[in-house]
Amino acid sequence: MTIQFLDAVPLTTLSGVGAAISDKLGRIGIHNLQDLLFHLPIRYEDRTRITPIHDLRPDAYATIEGLVQTCEVQFGKRPILNVSLSDGTSKIMLRFFNFNAGMKNSLQPGARVKAFGEVKRGRFMAEIHHPEYQIIRDNAPLILEETLTPIYSTTEGIKQNSLRKLTDQALAVLENIQIAEILPNEFNPHPFSLKEAIRFLHRPPPDVSLEALEKGTHPAQQRLIFEELLAHNLAMQKVRIGTQQFSAYPLSYQTDLKQRFLAQLPFTPTDAQVRVTQEIEQDLTHPFPMMRLVQGDVGSGKTLVAALAALLAIDNGKQVALMAPTEILAEQHATNFRRWFESLGIEVGWLAGKVKGKARQTELEKIRTGQVQMVVGTHALFQDEVEFSDLALVIVDEQHRFGVHQRLMLREKGKQADHYPHQLIMTATPIPRTLAMTVYADLDTSIIDELPPGRTPITTVAISEERRAEVIARVNHACVNEKRQAYWVCTLIDESEVLEAQAAEAIAEDLRKILPHLRIGLVHGRMKPAEKQDIMQAFKQAEIDLLVATTVIEVGVDVPNASLMIIENAERLGLSQLHQLRGRVGRGTTASFCVLMYKPPLGKISQKRLQVLRDTQDGFVISEKDLEIRGPGEVLGTKQTGVAEFKVANLMRDRKMIPTVQYYARRLIVEQPEVATKLIQRWINQREIYTHV
């Protein structure tokens, strides 16, 4: 039997898999036979040979065999079962911190035992804590594994052994079917077929290089990694090509509003802003929708670039919509654009969840009739009740975490008659080039790689929680003596907004007791949008000295007089998020400071993370380091959105393969488009989105 897509085979065809096991496997992304076979081991253990006890090395995993010499219970806070074993070359202690009477009775002196585990140094001899073990009865032969033992990532209720048995069944099914080799030989630079690679990686022979497997460089791994990266790249290219089949309003190059706008600015745009604006203007003249991502570090002036793009659309008699992720940021944009555009005779509308009743109906009517040439808001802009008059450009701020499917949905919502709007996506979270080339291959990318002159560098220091009193004194000095404002950011590792809000309230209360003369405000995710807005407005107008906040202030808030930021539990946040938070200060001409307060002792990864922030303020350098430390899923926020969740590939580890993948993808989509479609269907979950655009 020949099967093109193994995901057509349900898990329930395997023995022992019912609804309960299916649900548990679903938690780790295993929904069908293909998912199970693509759920490759995260590491391997060599249980194919016995190591003499004399030859054991600390921190290595090994299989040993010997006779029990002693079996004793050590009493203390909790009892420990200590079993000494000898094989004639030396002795070792097996230690069990959880044991029962049955284990104690079976491990009596004279019993022959085979055990596997991690070797540790002990006080008197080598030790293995909680080994896997087996009693060898009488003169029964010693049976060893024939292949390396795979270790899988798993979930509660699914043990390693259970997953191995299920994989054995899946491999047996694989033996009896023919999988279509979709990839033609001339497009496959690796010697393994798909079937051979899967079989090899689940059960590698003992003579394979463990080092190659750990590094992901074995040809069997490379075969699967290559095909998966190729499928993703093809999917993005299909979206890009598909976009060019749609119609958009080609905007003619107009300079009237642009020149009047630039003439009223108290500064000159940077060379980078000019370059990126030209790239956008070029795109907007095309008769198909622009899909462009503008990356710029915190404070690089992306809003100005967005304004110039908006003016070109408005000069052509069209409407513009700007969508921001939060009401705070959306209202800030509305205020800025009104200030900039009022003298040009352009009306800027505002639409968010809190605009209700008559005011909302009035705003909707203005949008429908075209009286409002630019409308700013949250995702409320794309609700069914909103009807645009002549929408030509959608600007999406800080939504780089959208996956391609969300970008396509947004495009559909903005469609009018047969025309789709141009899309400009802006982010202040620089995306590492490796990720941009893969995850955002459907977008053209512009980078604003220059900060406006006059920005003051931020001094960043890491201070232990034990010096909290000194930090509070520094806040007091900044607010009282220097007449500056400060942020105090609370972070919780628990994602519960309730707990985070409670922590922020407790800290604000403490600070009010210690600094009663300061005006201290509080903002957190549990507050109503209107409350948050009022507090932020008061902070902006210098009616609040110290703002205690959760990470809701990560994005876009602009208060030039704030020059000190304290981040509690800084070790709990990723580099890019810390960099975003730090970017809330240093927006004026005064020297600014960021204090990363941590709870000791710091782990190695946390030390590395805080050191990077002390060393650099370059968001692109920081994003690359973040990718190295945390991996692509975390950097993109894809734990929530499902962007770039690869089954086999690891973008950091496999980044050198990406240029080769791009070369083959470009050829394949032109020379054999039907093969490209089948590859996408095999590897990508949102099949219908990618293959039918």
Swiss-Prot record:
Catalysed reactions listed for this entry: Couples ATP hydrolysis with the unwinding of duplex DNA by translocating in the 3'-5' direction; ATP + H2O = ADP + phosphate + H(+)
Keywords (A to Z) from UniProt: ATP-binding, DNA damage, DNA recombination, DNA repair, DNA-binding, Helicase, Hydrolase, Isomerase, Nucleotide-binding
Enzyme Commission identifier(s): 5.6.2.4
InterPro entries, A to Z: ATP-dep_DNA_helicase_RecG, DEAD/DEAH_box_helicase_dom, Helicase_ATP-bd, Helicase_C-like, NA-bd_OB-fold, P-loop_NTPase, RecG/Mfd, RecG_dom3_C
Assembly and binders: Monomer.
Location of the motif DEAH box: 397-400
Keyword Glycosyltransferase in record: no
Gene Ontology MF term list: ATP binding; ATP hydrolysis activity; DNA binding; DNA helicase activity
Chain ranges of the Helicase ATP-binding domain: 283-448
Start and end residues of each stretch annotated as Wedge domain: 48-146
Entry remark concerning the domains of this protein: The wedge domain within the N-terminus inserts into the replication fork junction, where the lagging and leading strand split.
Free-text function comment from the UniProt entry: Plays a critical role in recombination and DNA repair. Helps process Holliday junction intermediates to mature products by catalyzing branch migration. Has replication fork regression activity, unwinds stalled or blocked replication forks to make a HJ that can be resolved. Has a DNA unwinding activity characteristic of a DNA helicase with 3'-5' polarity.
Positions of the Helicase C-terminal domain: 482-628
Annotated binding of ATP, by residue: 296-303
Any one Gene Ontology BP term: DNA recombination
Source domain of life: Bacteria
Protein name: ATP-dependent DNA helicase RecG
Keyword presence, Ribonucleoprotein: no
Pfam families in UniProt: DEAD, Helicase_C, RecG_dom3_C, RecG_wedge
Family affiliation: Belongs to the helicase family. RecG subfamily.
